[in-house]
């Protein structure tokens, strides 16, 4: 096996273990044993478990962002863009279940990038620009676009997590319900929202 092939093998083994057990519960011993190599081989390629985990997470983030960015950059109407973005996330969850499980688990302590929260922030900042333009067109305050972007992306991401853990509904139905809530909620935004219940 070439060095490159060995590296890919270790990434595949690590990805599966991180998805099944999480970062903390996975050991270098386990990774090397499943790959049929000695521990020094893992250290040689990645410097340790943290390095392997970082490569796995970076690949998963790139794959997910690629799908969502493609959906968001298409020159479509707002609803179609929302439908494509929700479908892109659900497609990723369906085709890369292990990858999504890794992304939604907590990152190792002290790691500020490569977490699900940072991924959500990246996607939300892209959505923010789309919403700001739509808000201006509808004479709503574009300064609230970051807030709505976080809410919208969070809703889709958390629903994706729920669907992964209990896939009783078809993917298309989940996407349709997501878009229904998001679109109809966005379609009726108040210019100056207020709470009606007194505190």
Predicted regions located by residue number:
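Amphipathic alpha-helical segments used for helix-helix packing
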Residues: 92-114, 128-132, 161-165
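Alpha-helical DNA-contacting segments of helix-turn-helix folds
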Residues: 53-60, 103, 119, 123
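Amphipathic alpha-helical packing segments from all-alpha helical-bundle domains
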Residues: 62-65, 112-136, 146-151, 173-176, ...
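N-terminal intrinsically disordered/low-complexity leader segments
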Residues: 1-5, 142, 190-199
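Short coil/turn segments at alpha/beta junctions that flank glycine-rich nucleotide-binding fingerprints
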Residues: 20-24, 75, 96, 138
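Helix-turn-helix
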Residues: 9, 13, 17-51, 55
